[in-house]
Structure formats: C-alpha cells, structure tokens
Amino acid sequence: MSLWVDKYRPCSLGRLDYHKEQAAQLRNLVQCGDFPHLLVYGPSGAGKKTRIMCILRELYGVGVEKLRIEHQTITTPSKKKIEISTIASNYHLEVNPSDAGNSDRVVIQEMLKTVAQSQQLETNSQRDFKVVLLTEVDKLTKDAQHALRRTMEKYMSTCRLILCCNSTSKVIPPIRSRCLAVRVPAPSIEDICHVLSTVCKKEGLNLPSQLAHRLAEKSCRNLRKALLMCEACRVQQYPFTADQEIPETDWEVYLRETANAIVSQQTPQRLLEVRGRLYELLTHCIPPEIIMKGLLSELLHNCDGQLKGEVAQMAAYYEHRLQLGSKAIYHLEAFVAKFMALYKKFMEDGLEGMMF
C-alpha cells in the first residue's frame, strides 16, 4: 500500500494537472535534440521532482522507472571516507551532495567523473549522454559550486545535469548562466482543489468542495502536504464533512508549544528546556530553517506592532548566521535567548508605563 502522493504521481508530461503550457515547452525542449543543463527551482511541494522525472521519462522511456538504491564510499584527499546513498537507473543518477556536509565538493567531482566515463548498458535509448540529478543545490558550499561549474564544462559531451533547488539566490551566477532555468511556481488554490477532487474520485471517495478548499489553504499551496493531509483526514474520519478537523503534524504542534513556553516565561531554566525541545526537533530531521520560520511565525502572534519589526529583523540576522554556520542549535538558541531578553524588557517597560 503506497501513499496517495506516490500512487497518483503523474509519470509523463502529458498527464500533469497544472502548468500545462510549461509541460508543453519542456516536451519541445526534449524533442529538439540539443538538451541543455537544467536548473529547476520553486517552492517545496510545487512539483519540481515530478516534472524532472517526467522529463527523464520523455528522454529515455520507461527504463528510468527501474530504480535501484546504491551506497557508495568516497575517499577524500585527507583519507576520510564518506558514505553516500544514490538512486540510479541505467540512464540517470540522483544524489544529494549536501548530505556530505563540507566534503560535498569531493562527492560532486567523483560522482560526475564516474557517470561521465561509464557507458550506458542499453544502447537503444538514442541518447549519447546520461543525466545526473543533483538535489538541494542551494545548500552546497561555495567550493562545491565552483567545482560543479568546472565539471559541467569538462563532461558536457557525455553528461547532462539537472539541478534542483528551492531558490536560486544561493546558487552562484556562473552555474546559473550555464543552465536553462525552469521555475515551477506553487500551484494555485484552485489547482490543488482540482487535484484533491481527482484523487478522491479515483479512490471512490466523495470530497466536499469546502473541505478541499480548507485543505488547499492550510497546506500553504504545497500540493504534497495537501494530499498527505487529505489522506490523514480519510484515516481519521469518513464520510468526509465540510467542517471536519484537519489533523496537524506532530512537529507543528510541538513547535507551537515551544513558542508558547518561550512567551510564558523568560528564565535560564526555561531557556534550557527550550534548548532540549529544539534538539528534539533537529534529531527528528526537521530542517533548522523550518524551525526558525515556524518559531518566528508563532512568536509574532504574541507581539505588538513595534515589537514585531524588531523580532523579524532579529530572526533574519540569526537565520543568516544559521546559513553560515554548521551547528544549527547555537543559532536557534541564540535567537530564543535574544527574544526572551527583548520580550521581558518590553513587558517590564509596559508594566512601568501602566503604574505611572
């Protein structure tokens, strides 16, 4: 039994439910013969990976769906061994180099070199190149990005790159200039409602339009999240009702409780408790950027107009530090400590003003 997001994922460009003009342009790009490097970017849950797999299907046929998971060990110049997991077919290789941390440069160089120098096992694909799909390119170190730029030029004849990321702002200009940029915007509320209704019909379920609209809005235009929430609603209660409760993920509830704990008390003991809660989120693989964004959103509900600006500016500062550093907990805890000091001073000043 598979999740709806996997079970009903379109496998060809002609079956995509939205951005159909873009799908037609991508099909023309594949058929023209001169396939370039691609930089596919857009918000989470917009359908980037689905479109990339559809492009690969258009390039090579059904063979790209015969996937295998491979584990490779790469040795760095300092003799350190790095284990990397990849997903591969006979025609392409998918890897997330940022999993290797500061050694991502070595991973990129070795992976691309291996793929570019190996021959395809099936020769009837009529393509003289393989494709390497690199995910989360915006999380690569600058060294790795410069190495990627050099490698792109070196192996252009036997290898094409498809780079996938949420934002191009952290991708260096030399890479952006060597790729055809493909922006995948988030689907509209109407698009998500249509997809939810279609999936529920295929499952033999009756989804009220009001519930579909609420799911689409609560997902923040993230189609993957909307489908997962819809499936959770199905498990929780069926037949659906227009006003039924939409279940939240555990980490979102936990993050809200953490924000409430910060606002309710500003002491060293409470800061220690919050640090433990932040560790709990990080160990469950919640990205630190998401934690920072969620904390800010919840904390702003407890701030007035003047304080909101200061807190948002402070969050931007520590989020920037978070990107530069390697220990997320330091910057998250520093943000919480700074907020506690600011909020406590604000409340004390407010009380003094009321007394006089």
From Swiss-Prot:
Pfam families: DNA_pol3_delta2 (PF13177), RCF1-5-like_lid (PF21960), RFC_C (PF22534). SMART domains: AAA. Its main location: nucleus. GO terms for molecular function: ATP hydrolysis activity; ATP-dependent activity, acting on DNA; DNA binding; DNA clamp loader activity. The modification N6-acetyllysine is found at K20. One of its GO terms (cellular component) is DNA replication factor C complex. The modification Phosphoserine is found at S125. Gene3D superfamilies: 1.10.8.60, 1.20.272.10, P-loop containing nucleotide triphosphate hydrolases. SUPFAM superfamilies: P-loop containing nucleoside triphosphate hydrolases (SSF52540), post-AAA+ oligomerization domain-like (SSF48019). Keywords: Acetylation, DNA replication, DNA-binding, Nucleus, Phosphoprotein. GO terms for biological process: DNA repair; DNA replication; DNA strand elongation involved in DNA replication; DNA synthesis involved in DNA repair; DNA-templated DNA replication; positive regulation of DNA-directed DNA polymerase activity. It is found in: Nucleus. The keyword DNA-binding applies. Belongs to the activator 1 small subunits family. Subunit of the RFC complex, an heteropentameric complex consisting of a large subunit RFC1 and four small subunits RFC2, RFC3, RFC4 and RFC5; the RFC complex interacts with PCNA. Forms an heterotetrameric complex with RFC2, RFC4 and RFC5; this complex has ATPase activity but is not stimulated by PCNA. The heterotetramer of subunits RFC2, RFC3, RFC4 and RFC5 interacts with RAD17. Interacts with CNTD1; this interaction facilitates crossover formation. Subunit of the replication factor C (RFC) complex which acts during elongation of primed DNA templates by DNA polymerases delta and epsilon, and is necessary for ATP-dependent loading of proliferating cell nuclear antigen (PCNA) onto primed DNA. This is Replication factor C subunit 3.
